[in-house]
From Swiss-Prot:
It comes from Saccharomyces cerevisiae (strain ATCC 204508 / S288c) (Baker's yeast). PROSITE patterns: HMG_BOX_2. Gene3D superfamilies: High mobility group box domain. GO terms for biological process: chromatin organization; chromatin remodeling; DNA repair; maintenance of transcriptional fidelity during transcription elongation by RNA polymerase III; protein-DNA complex assembly; RNA polymerase II preinitiation complex assembly; RNA polymerase III preinitiation complex assembly. This is Non-histone chromosomal protein 6A. Residues 7-16 have a biased composition (Basic residues).
Length: 93
């Protein structure tokens, strides 16, 4: 005998405020944004998922010295985000 299930209740996600500051990018994201077009030009018939995989492989192959500029950009972006977030929260309160 099968018992009827109760319908699942949908949880509604809170709408994101369009005025909220953009989140900080990671060092990998700065690297990926800079190198995505290069990977695509080297492999024109590659799929979207494979581009990400190639970028991940390239990122892992970098030495800490080669990653340094991207990590510096990420630190600067994190500071930008934190200051913008502070300003944003002050306007809400």
């Amino acid at each position: 005998m099968v018992t009827p299930r109760e319908p699942k209740k949908r949880t509604t996600r809170k709408k994101k405020d369009p005025n909220a500051p953009k989140r900080a990018l990671s060092a990998y994201m700065f690297f990926a944004n800079e190198n995505r077009d290069i990977v695509r030009s080297e492999n024109p018939d590659i799929t979207f998922g494979q581009v990400g995989k190639k970028l991940g492989e390239k990122w892992k192959a970098l030495t800490p010295e080669e990653k340094q500029p991207y990590e510096a950009k990420a630190q600067a972006d994190k500071k930008r985000y934190e200051s913008e977030k502070e300003l944003y929260n002050a306007t809400l309160a």
